[in-house]
Amino acid sequence: MKKVVKFGGSSLASAEQFKKVGDIIRSDESRRYVVPSAPGKRFDGDIKVTDMLYECYRAAEKGEKIAGKIKKIQARYQEIIDGLELDLKLDEQFAEIEKNFIAQAGSDYAASRGEFLNGIVMANYLG
């Protein structure tokens, strides 16, 4: 029987947490479909990636510059990627996300990008 497993934001908030999730997935061959959330809070006072993406969406909607906000999100993912020792760059994906926010992509788009990006990281980590 094949299983679908969903991991929440706090369980994918850092490279250390990613490794634990990887161990869980690898421990049961029937866990074939993985649904990752966007990275959540790493510690009290931290900001969830989804909230950071919503902030970009709202700023872009007002015509404000969002490059700095995008870079903060990208740095968060890069920290995870580096901690997992992956040879992975998300530059193209972040450029596309920034372009789409500026073109007034909706709030649903903002909500989905964290999961989208974490899916890429997870797929590369699991091989």
Role assignments for model-derived ranges:
Residues 1-127:
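Nucleotide/pyrophosphate-binding catalytic subdomain
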